[in-house]
Amino acid sequence: MAALGLLLQAAAACGSAGPLRLGRCYRGARGLCTRLAEPDGLEGARQEDEEEQPPPPGAEEQSTAMVKDSRDLLKEFPQPKNLLNSVIGRALGISHARDKLVYIHTNGPRKKKVTLHIKWPKNVEVEGYGTKKIDAERQAAAAACQLFKGWGLLGPRNELFDAAKYRLLADQLGCPDERWCSEGKWRSKSGPSLADLSTCWRRMEPDDPIQPMEQGRMPKAMRREELEEGELEEGELEEGELEEEAIDVSDYLPMAHQDARTPGRDASRGGSSIEMTDDNTAIRALTQFPLPKNLLAQVIQIATSSSTVKEYMQFRTVGTKTKICKLTLRWPCPMTFAAKGRRKVEAENKAAALACQKLKSLGLVDKNNNPLSHAMYNMTSLRELGENQRKPCHIKVPEATLRKIENYLNHYPVDIRESRPRIADDMMNLSKESGAISDAITGKTYIPMLEAEEVRLSQNLLALWKRRGSSWQESHPLPVDPHKDTILSAIEQNPVVVIAGDTGCGKTTRIPQLLLEHYILEGRGARCNVVITQPRRISAISVAQRVAQELGPNMRKNVGYQVRLESKPPARGGALLFCTVGILLRKLQGNPSLEGVSHVVVDEVHERDVNTDFLLILLKGIQKLNPDLRLVLMSATGDNQRFSHYFGGCPVVKVPGFMYPVKEYYLEEILAKLGRHRHRHYEIKQSDDECVLDLDLITDLVLQIDAHGEPGGILCFLPGWQEIKGVQQRLLEMLGSQNSRYLVLPVHSNIPMMDQQNIFQRPPPGVRKIVLATNIAETSITINDIVHVVDSGTHKEERYDLKTKVSCLETVWVSKSNVVQRRGRAGRCQSGFAYHLFPRSRLDKMPTYQVPEILRTPLENLVVQAKIHMPEKTAVEFLSKALDSPDIKAVDEAVILLQEIGVLDQREALTTLGKRLAQISTDPRLAKAIVLASIYRCLHPLLVIVSCLTRDPFSSSLQNRAEVDKAKAVLSRESGSDHLAFVRAVAGWEEVLRRRDSRARDNYLQDYYLYGPSLRFINGLVKQFSENLYEAFLVSSPSDCTMPSSVCNQYSEEEELVKGVLMAGLYPNLIQVRQGKVTRQGKFKPNSYAYRTKAGTVLLHKSTINREASKLYSRWLTYFMAVKSNGGVFVRDSSQVHPLAVLLMTDTDIHVRDDGWRATVSLTDSDLLVLEGDSYTIRLLRDFRVSLSKMVETCLCYEMAAIPGDLHHQHSQLLDILVDLLKGPPGSFGA
């Protein structure tokens, strides 16, 4: 620390001199280097001489002491880039610190080097090294955090201070004068904010010609800045890193002062030559501007975006006793000022004060004598750009295409209404009208069992049961077994029973068996048909397999499961069917009263997921239709009395569990075990709700448990897939050649069930099993050999922002009940250990239970489901019956959106479109895109896109995001579409599968960073959606959907049409791209893009290829997924779409303004699209749009296979013309 003190003293000594230039570099032991620099203005020869000198004695030892091992630094500062951003952001009142932290990358043969330029509170450089760019950046940032801590800018536990304290600390450090350029938030009074400019001015040649600045020309420094910014954007942004807050030029202009004078008005009239002025005038000017040289330098730096002022202002001083200074300015036009003084500095200050006086008269300094913002200095360019952006996009349609449109409209006038059969309602309700209902167990048509058949089947079941020998229950007793009679009696006597069973009591596997056994032994086994819901696919399958095993080979066929894309149902009559909640909801559409079902068991009801809460509403109503149905709610933890009260005070049967003792450790003890300091980021964030994981700490803890802990499996709870893969990769790297001694197994819904069976198997002797799982392993699955539980204390939770209408999947702290569940996983089979990676004080702040999902998610899909099951009720009426009713405003917003996209009418009834898409099991907007694709005959690519938006095909992780983005860009080619990249990725996968070459298959996955299990799942989704389309009468056969030769795929190769159909389904998810933006600090960026939606400004996430697009061919993007993070809304997937697709294919109203020669057309619900053209073209496009709309309406009223031949031919002509239109140029960008 003594060496660190020397370093800080040196920094403080240099700080008052202004910006620091690179000086000597002493390398630390672990590849980190901190450089203190020398004041700007020293001669180059002096620098060269110093660099030739050997390091002072002990310098290497001081450096080694000063710079810790990089690993220790990263443990002390686990998220260093975020921490630096937060300190500077809070100190300066800015949303990002990009201008104050510049990362310069140098690629070495084996290692990456990063030089971090820190421009606040002092100009200092630090270096970092790593095998990857992000590692080098993090090392450099950690070294910078160490400096900040030494300067007192961080608390003992790395906590932040308030802005006022940072200003005080900055004054003490003598830091540069920082302010919000346009708002004048605060000024440092501790000294000059720029270097002593006299040295560099003295070195300038006085006779250099001074040229005026060209109006509208951006200086060279702007290009340099953009390069640095580009380097920043190329690097990996850490999770949570702040994004720049900015507004587009058109929004900024009305906020700027209309009378603001700019260089383009007064200053550009020509230069002025000012002779020696009266000394009193100069003194008055100096009184008005006490630090004139600083102010001049600041104004010029801000206005010109230059890092140096040498080329814009020169001082030339002559004389002996009386010094005469001539100041020549090149900006805003050539001007010369002269003043005298007894000393050189006095003369220079007077001349500079006169220059400041002149700038203020030109309106280039504000009333408080502070610089204006960069945008205000560039108002001329800004206004020109704003005017350019406001111009409509000019559309010119080829004459040949116009003739085709004209001929079509002459042959099929838009004012002639087609006669459409009124068959839509009949068609969509065929099964109900015929009286046919589906069997909830088998999925086939339900036929009640005859009494004789029932008796015979019951006798067979009894015989099978008696032949099974000793039961599994007898040899493997569980805590629930002694309560068998109490449970069965309660279920027999009450329509609803709540079973509150502690973790490990056996309720999930045993109670369904108890019900089946009870009915069989009473001779009515054929009447026992139990549907058991599980919240997740993996638990439905694994529990079914476990129960089948326990029942033995004679009864195994009576147990089955059904999840999305996987089904193995049992025969009806003495059946146990395990399924997900979504599957049961689907079954209720075909069997609303659950005829033929004896019991519904809802397991894990305490998790309060949105589907379970919705199911409870329906089950409450079904009891009136089917009084014989028995409902069993099973809960591990939670407020069980609430469930009882919801169902009219039904009984609650409590079943105590058995758990071996579990020794618990919290963060304080864990850090002590690892020999670490307590000031971890968990404690930094302790006062906030935010939680950020330290994957290195988790990895180290797992290795510590392996080295010193008891034998047995380790279960690590992590919030999501990225964290699972991050810890898995770290473990495999650390274990190295010893990998064979470990079984590292991820558990996640992204992984197919067949790839996760190993988690239930005991590993061979000498092999340690390490399971990395989300909260899926809390209650849904049981891994019997777990001894150690590592609890991160976090999980992913979806939250919906009503204001921005955007969902956010956030990492949040779990509840106390979650902590209890996780701890219980360690004591199932023997004494265990639980390691909680949060302080005990955090446990006290955790909520008792989770917030129900229905209160924090978008409700559109739920409203559609409500209309299917109870169409006579309004959405608010239906959802008010929930255990926890969602906000009425949230329900109303969902209804409004569904009305906007044409799913509901004004009476809240399902439209013809709504009835079709209700058959498709996905988000309503994606379902709409699928329905439209069947009409526009480009179905297969849309099925692939929707499937990939449901399950990402790329093998993305925190470490390989950049490579995945590059692979996606390659697949996208020139389409400007993430969605078409999905289509090409899946098409390539199908091609290599057809070759039956395993090496080619593996190479393809590796080359494009694709994940095989996800691609298999996507293939299954495509098949499921094909079945849905068949059920909705939109295709003749499910196989038509994937056949290139089928009618529904006639235009599947037309990329602009595919993107247009996707946009039509997702609308109003439309982005207008505008060139030029102004940051919150007033920085004008003419070459940057701003992105506007109907709801407001958004940002493009790094995962979309259009974020890095150097040139967009269209000003319009469509998207599906937007997430809220760090106060901004980020779009993760996007496609550039043709403006004519937006005009012609959306189902919103349009407005046409026609003067008889030129016409403009715009959307009435937003200002995102304004097109112009000649009147004739616009009128033809308007009528053509009506024809397309009528085609969609007509097709929705027909069974697609039964559309008459003349209509089919007419629609083919229409689609041919549309394809031609979309092949035309999209119009000039910004013109």
UniProtKB/Swiss-Prot annotation:
Any Gene Ontology biological process: ribosome biogenesis
Residues at which ATP binds: G501, D502, T503, G504, C505, G506, K507, T508
Localisation: Cytoplasm; Mitochondrion; Mitochondrion matrix, Mitochondrion nucleoid
Main location: cytoplasm
Domain Helicase C-terminal: 697-870
Keywords associated with the record: ATP-binding, Cytoplasm, Helicase, Hydrolase, Mitochondrion, Mitochondrion nucleoid, Nucleotide-binding, Repeat, Ribosome biogenesis, RNA-binding
Stored PROSITE patterns: DEAH_ATP_HELICASE, HELICASE_ATP_BIND_1, HELICASE_CTER
Coiled coil region boundaries: none
EC number: 3.6.4.13
Domain DRBM, residue spans: 80-148, 292-359
Stretches for region Disordered: 39-65
Family annotation (Pfam families): DEAD, dsrm, DSRM_2, HA2_C, Helicase_C, OB_NTP_bind
GO CC field: cytoplasm; mitochondrial nucleoid; mitochondrion; nucleus
Function: RNA-dependent helicase. Plays an important role in the assembly of the mitochondrial large ribosomal subunit. Required for optimal function of the zinc-finger antiviral protein ZC3HAV1. Associates with mitochondrial DNA. Involved in nervous system development and differentiation through its involvement in the up-regulation of a number of genes which are required for neurogenesis, including GSC, NCAM1, neurogenin, and NEUROD.
PANTHER family found in the cross-reference section: ATP-DEPENDENT RNA HELICASE (PTHR18934), ATP-DEPENDENT RNA HELICASE DHX30 (PTHR18934:SF257)
Protein name in the entry: ATP-dependent RNA helicase DHX30
Species name: Gallus gallus (Chicken)
Gene name of the record: DHX30
